[in-house]
Amino acid sequence: METSASATASEKQEAKSGILEAAGFPDPGKKASPLVVAAAAAAAVAAQGVPQHLLPPFHAPLPIDMRHQEGRYHYEPHSVHGVHGPPALSGSPVISDISLIRLSPHPAGPGESPFNAPHPYVNPHMEHYLRSVHSSPTLSMISAARGLSPADVAQEHLKERGLFGLPAPGTTPSDYYHQMTLVAGHPAPYGDLLMQSGGAASAPHLHDYLNPVDVSRFSSPRVTPRLSRKRALSISPLSDASLDLQRMIRTSPNSLVAYINNSRSSSAASGSYGHLSAGALSPAFTFPHPINPVAYQQILSQQRGLGSAFGHTPPLIQPSPTFLAQQPMALTSINATPTQLSSSSNCLSDTNQNKQSSESAVSSTVNPVAIHKRSKVKTEPEGLRPASPLALTQGQVSGHGSCGCALPLSQEQLADLKEDLDRDDCKQEAEVVIYETNCHWEDCTKEYDTQEQLVHHINNEHIHGEKKEFVCRWQACTREQKPFKAQYMLVVHMRRHTGEKPHKCTFEGCSKAYSRLENLKTHLRSHTGEKPYVCEHEGCNKAFSNASDRAKHQNRTHSNEKPYICKIPGCTKRYTDPSSLRKHVKTVHGPDAHVTKKQRNDVHLRTPLLKENGDSEAGTEPGGPESTEASSTSQAVEDCLHVRAIKTESSGLCQSSPGAQSSCSSEPSPLGSAPNNDSGVEMPGTGPGSLGDLTALDDTPPGADTSALAAPSAGGLQLRKHMTTMHRFEQLKKEKLKSLKDSCSWAGPTPHTRNTKLPPLPGSGSILENFSGSGGGGPAGLLPNPRLSELSASEVTMLSQLQERRDSSTSTVSSAYTVSRRSSGISPYFSSRRSSEASPLGAGRPHNASSADSYDPISTDASRRSSEASQCSGGSGLLNLTPAQQYSLRAKYAAATGGPPPTPLPGLERMSLRTRLALLDAPERTLPAGCPRPLGPRRGSDGPTYGHGHAGAAPAFPHEAPGGGARRASDPVRRPDALSLPRVQRFHSTHNVNPGPLPPCADRRGLRLQSHPSTDGGLARGAYSPRPPSISENVAMEAVAAGVDGAGPEADLGLPEDDLVLPDDVVQYIKAHASGALDEGTGQVYPTESTGFSDNPRLPSPGLHGQRRMVAADSNVGPSAPMLGGCQLGFGAPSSLNKNNMPVQWNEVSSGTVDALASQVKPPPFPQGNLAVVQQKPAFGQYPGYSPQGLQASPGGLDSTQPHLQPRSGAPSQGIPRVNYMQQLRQPVAGSQCPGMTTTMSPHACYGQVHPQLSPSTISGALNQFPQSCSNMPAKPGHLGHPQQTEVAPDPTTMGNRHRELGVPDSALAGVPPPHPVQSYPQQSHHLAASMSQEGYHQVPSLLPARQPGFMEPQTGPMGVATAGFGLVQPRPPLEPSPTGRHRGVRAVQQQLAYARATGHAMAAMPSSQETAEAVPKGAMGNMGSVPPQPPPQDAGGAPDHSMLYYYGQIHMYEQDGGLENLGSCQVMRSQPPQPQACQDSIQPQPLPSPGVNQVSSTVDSQLLEAPQIDFDAIMDDGDHSSLFSGALSPSLLHSLSQNSSRLTTPRNSLTLPSIPAGISNMAVGDMSSMLTSLAEESKFLNMMT
């Protein structure tokens, strides 16, 4: 890379002329590059039939693939055979001629790729040169036409020219090479032709040997992978005993080729392998005999050229005058690159030193077009070089590219060059080349003739003169006279002002000099190939010549940390390494804006909101880092459109576009050259401005990422990466910084809101902070950033691997690779951030995610990005994972891998699964209400659209709900935004699941969302599951989050909709039941609920979703006594039914309860409907139960709910209450609906007991009174309406609590003002216990009001209605048969969870209660917000609503006015008590128990068990459903299951939990869609995660 710098143009010319003369070529002007010589030699050899063994170094051209990008070149020696050259072309053919001429007599086979055919005698060098030809249009075209490989073309060309002066079969390779060198003297027609035709693409490869001039100016598809990040070792590999490397290096003016090629850069994209650059000699290129130094130099220079072809800086060889005259344009381009390099190097010198001379390279780096900077030559100042191409070429070449003139280069190239230079030379010493001869010390105006004199003067008179004071008093010194600790430090510092560089490279031909000895030592490694710094990451063997490169690599590749933050006010850039930060400061803020070490180390998080997204743009070096994806890779999440990309690119935060000369330029981030990512993760195909570029920028800047990560708010900057051009990024940076702060809209400008980049925010807590900072309360403001921040802060922090910076090798690898590679240590979500995100979107879910998002399959970043795109539909969130979600992912991973459990999040343990779910769902909730995701068609398996019966508009899934934030692809927790129906729908796999039309959802969303905009943010982000979830818990949490966030049942199950792994019988059962039971029974009830939701458009907000769901349950329970009878059966009976319908799971969940219920469970006339409801409750109860204490602990208001939940979740422990509840429910189920109601009341009473925390007596009474309450329900509708509203209002607190508790209420609460939640809760409670008496109901409200968040939580907490109405309100899933006997109950619960989540609208369609229910189940807050009401209100929607309802057994039935009635069946109830019969009908469908329905008892007990222990067997064994169920259930459910080993013991069939939407179980599992079987399944899940 420093090659040009090392040799002066004159030296090069002399060397070349000497070579040419020696070769007998008098025409120095037309020097052929060594590559040409090699090619000629090869051709000659072939023509002469040189034995194959003679030219072992010649290898067939390597196909261009990942290996090349990663620099992994495998040279397989092969025999060389004679080649028959075609008739020579006379003169310099034109492209047209070339295209018509067949260079090779051997036609390519019909199926053969003319480019991939290995050529027997293409030497490694030629391979390198020719390799790019493959990608070069010109050569490719020509060679393709002739059926030639690029090597063939070169050889043919050489042959044509009669360059067959190779030795006979006895000659040695060294002789051969020497001859080739001689041959190089001949002009190369093709080279000329290529150059003339502008076939730069191929030229870069052939130019060296075909032409005297480097063709780097020709842009090749692969030419700008970006200068290799790895310093290509010019020839260190060729340390043959007979080869005098030292001599070669010193005598070769091109010895710095490696530097020019950026061999130092570690980017795999550069195509360098370790030190070897693609252009470097192949390891196979051995010289048995001493090689002519000149020839070797020629070869090296060729390599250098190659390097440029591969994105390396072309050797700064001065083209012959002839060539210049012929190719002025080419020179301009080529020269630009060298200039760039030199200027980059200069500017990149030492940031510390760059401050002083603004005219130095820094400027040049900043301004690639025409930057005049002094020559790098330290001996004397060199006048500014002319900008003219010729001047540039000559001056630049002569000055080794030190010339400051930068010819116009593509911004990518500039960025690459800059970055490379920076890394190499400048990185070592980013000091601006200064040649000061005048003293500017204070009060000193002495002037000297030479720098030496000045230095002497300063040292003697100023430094040593002021013996005890080591202060720099140089005018305008950035240190501001801050004293140094030692004199030597001041002496070294003064070199920054004087430009003295006493440490000169001792290698011949290298003129590098450094002011710091350490920099020289590092530089010398480029000559020696020494790489003492080995990556410390286990399993990574990469070595680096300097610690900075290693640190950069480790930070980018193995972590998301960006500790180096730009301290310039208003700049939020963050970088992985100090050199990138220095480069950024110097290039973006100017050489004077020096960042001191202290400043660099002062990594306080920046306030910029963008950073909050987790990956600050700063994280993406200049430009790239700046544009670091906002908070989440999911672009969709970020903007609802862009949030999906894991690395959300917050264009707004891009202070300097990667392509822009500013920071982006300074850090030749991949933005300029998408293929070139500092982290190397970016896919080579990515173009500048593309997501990949942005991502690459994020990753590329070595320090950029770090910085970005360091500052959560910098995340927004990531969008900037998206900007196609550097300038655009600049603008975005400035504009977005403001816009990002304002809202998620920042993601809009850059669809890939990269802010979601995974860089860990300073703290996991920062996620919430970010959320709040983003606009915490508001879906719009909070959405993109909140989730991003959430993900970035906690997920990134917790799942640093998640953010794993793209690897240099990520270029071409698919996200799957990246996932496995990167997320191997993290949860599957992270593993396939992108893919998972895409899958969560599901085929049916339309999203902004573009395939580009997954551009970097290998890198998390890439995944991040693609997932971001995929998650466009999803909410906006880094990973859309709250710290709790991240924790759960980590816990899962740890459990699967047997590693130590992750450190529990603070408060995670005390949070109930619901809360965790809420947390998980929060990101979705954070989706701007205004950005409802388009509802994609449900997957075929999902059955009718959620709202098949509703307005025909597909209801948005909870994750699609405005509140839903995008989540990273690897963000399983967060299913696609509520906007996407398919996920949620999949839960039922029956139309029930399908939410109502999205528009209705949007409407409701609009209504409610407004009130609970912050619901998503608050709940999802506010609540963390206090206790660290076990793997199952994590799975459940993820599933819940996924389910909550997930769009459909599938999401609820934690499985991709179509990926939902359910036994065929279960699927059929679900479908039959869903269509039949839901349609018939639950269908009626649910439709009622749906209607209720529809009736309550205001339920639209995410909070509404949660409310709706719960309301629906509530409605079922309380709308009318009869209806409530059925509803209660749906809710109350659901408890039993849940146990029955999802016998294994539910029964296992509450063994004690199961016993009583078990017998009844088996006979579930309407248990399915009820069971579904109960299941929901169980699921949530389990969730809460899972961490019911957690719920209790986390939400104050939830306490009552938690107890409530506990009785239910903890039923095993609170077996009696649960049993009672179950029994009561069951009795109602078995008995009349009313009795069921009454019975349900008992369960509700149990819940009430829990509620008692809320308002034990009241709730208890209310619950017990609920049947009466049925009547009351109608009366309470208004009240409910208020509660709903209230529920929405409490959003922030409620959300947090709710999230903690269940996550569902949060949604409902978050979106709804706290008063509503309170009211809603009371309503729900009322619904649940209509009898609960308005008093009790009111009490609940009062209770809730006191702790509205808690209230919501209580709503959510209890599977049934929140607090008072938890039990009764519990949506009854019975209508929707669970896939298996799990019963639609479980499935319903899952569905409800997923549905509530996914179809917040369904909930919305349902009465507010339903809405609440939805919110409750899935962090419906987010979903609700996102898809507030897409209620399938009337149609099957009713059932879907119910699904939502029973999804949240706990969902509060905060029905807005008449919410009880409105609530799903509640509506029916309200409209007609008969609805209960509908409930019964829905229950009746239960007869079609899902497989293993009767097995329920142990499984159910297990689930119900509060124990955190997770039954992986049960969960995973549940297989498709189990894990889904666990997902649907809270981690507590999972724990309960595990506690009840019965679940483990219970046949996997018995574990009917599969009915729970995949989204509900951990998304990872869902996404992995293979890990739903057991602990082994869990392991499988982990494996899939990885």
Swiss-Prot record:
Keyword Signal: no
PANTHER family, A to Z: TRANSCRIPTIONAL ACTIVATOR CUBITUS INTERRUPTUS, ZINC FINGER PROTEIN GLI2
Tissues with expression: Expressed in breast cancers (at protein level). Isoform 1 and isoform 4 are expressed in HTLV-1-infected T-cell lines (at protein level). Isoform 1 and isoform 2 are strongly expressed in HTLV-1-infected T-cell lines. Isoform 3 and isoform 4 are weakly expressed in HTLV-1-infected T-cell lines.
Main localisation: nucleus
Pfam families: zf-C2H2, zf-C2H2_15
Positions with biased composition (Polar residues): 1-10, 342-367, 791-802, 1469-1485
Phosphothreonine: residues bearing it: 725
Modified residues (Phosphoserine): 149, 234, 236, 242, 388, 1011
Name of protein: Zinc finger protein GLI2
Zn-finger region bounds: C2H2-type: 437-464, 475-497, 503-527, 533-558, 564-589
Residues bearing PTM N6-acetyllysine: 757
Stretches for region Disordered: 1-22, 342-389, 577-636, 650-716, 742-879, 925-1030, 1182-1215, 1421-1441, 1469-1498
Sequence ranges of Low complexity compositional bias: 654-674, 809-824, 947-961
Role played: Functions as a transcription regulator in the hedgehog (Hh) pathway. Functions as a transcriptional activator. May also function as transcriptional repressor. Requires STK36 for full transcriptional activator activity. Required for normal embryonic development.
